[in-house]
A protein has these predicted regions:
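An amphipathic, aromatic/His-enriched active-site/gating alpha helix that lines ligand/cofactor pockets
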Residues: 31-39, 58-95
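Short glycine-/aliphatic-rich beta-strand segments at the starts of folded cytosolic domains
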Residues: 2-15
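Short, charged/polar surface micro-motifs in flexible loops or helix N-caps
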Residues: 15, 50-51, 57-63
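Glycine-rich beta-strand-turn "strand-cap" elements at beta-sheet edges
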Residues: 2, 40-48, 77-113
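Hydrophobic pocket/interface hotspot
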Residues: 9, 21, 53
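Short amphipathic alpha-helical segments
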Residues: 13-40
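A broad, low-specificity signal marking well-ordered, structured residues that form hydrophobic/aromatic
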Residues: 7, 42, 51
Length: 113
């Protein structure tokens, strides 16, 4: 059984921007970028002005994302998202890895498939 890797990206989002953000990712997910990173599932969440982006992939997504930051599709998506998404902590944000939450606990039911 293949291990699923996860990354949770945390940022701020503009009020009312969820449909626009979802549309940008729907367009991007139809291209090659998810395959380059190994994304198998993506979920976007909103909690007030907090943007939560859960990536599930077949390999650790952090290093894979770092490898594609200069890819034209990544740059285009990132540029378009700046209209709606801003760093959670602008003082410490330097690259996408600075927006990734640190997983400190995981439990999985050993009997679940």
């Amino acid at each position: 059984m293949n291990q699923t890797h996860r990354a949770l990206i945390v940022a701020r989002m503009a009020p009312g921007s969820a449909p626009d953000i979802a549309g940008l990712f729907a367009g991007s997910d139809a291209g090659e970028l998810p395959h380059l990173v190994g994304v198998t599932r993506r979920s976007l969440f909103q909690f007030g002005d907090v943007y939560l982006h859960l990536i599930e992939s077949d390999r650790p997504p952090g290093p894979a994302i770092a490898k594609v930051t200069e890819h034209p599709e990544f740059r285009d998506l990132s540029e378009r998202l700046t209209a709606y998404i801003s760093p959670h902590d602008p003082d410490t944000w330097r690259s996408p890895k600075d927006a990734m939450a640190h997983e400190f606990y995981r439990w999985e039911n050993p009997g679940a498939k």
